[in-house]
Amino acid sequence: ILGYIAFAFRKVSHPFRYGICAIIAMLHDVLVVVGIFAILGKHFGVEIDALFVTALLTVIGFSVHDTIVVFDRIRENQLRRYGESFEQIVNISLLQTLVRSVNTSMTVIFTLLALYFFGGTTIKHFVLALLIGIVSGTYSSIFNASLLLVSWENKDFLRIFRRAEPEAA
């Protein structure tokens, strides 16, 4: 994934940053699904099986694809809007891809909800893993990956992890 994204984004500065940010967003999505299923397994006896692994692989593909769509628009706008700040370019790119990302995700979510409520019991956990992963993937491709990219571009990467000081009243 890192190699493909670095090759695809070779015309922008620091193409490996795009790949690393996409991988971090993808790991976020996988960890969200695994974490929720760990809680479900502990409290409700939900077991991990081959369908769960299939759902994780599908979530990975969806997450990376959605992130690449956002990053591709950032790349296009960098070439078109030369001279604007990187934050402005990312903001414009997010606004341009937001409707597409939400519409794609909602289409998948409605289909998965129909499968969850009207499908067989054997695929309920598979569909639930997909639902959690698609929601997490949509969120992370829009917000997490872009924030990481902007923070890294501004060399302010560690600011994300710092806690804000409380203001005096």
Predicted regions and their residues:
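Alpha-helical membrane-inserting segments
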Residues: G3-Y4, A8, V32, I36, ...
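Hydrophobic transmembrane alpha-helices and their membrane-interface caps
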Residues: P15-D72
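Membrane-spanning helices that line or support transport/gating and their immediate boundary helices
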Residues: G19, V34, D66-R73, N77, ...
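Transmembrane alpha-helix detector for multi-pass membrane proteins
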Residues: V53-R73, V99, T104-F110, Y139-A145
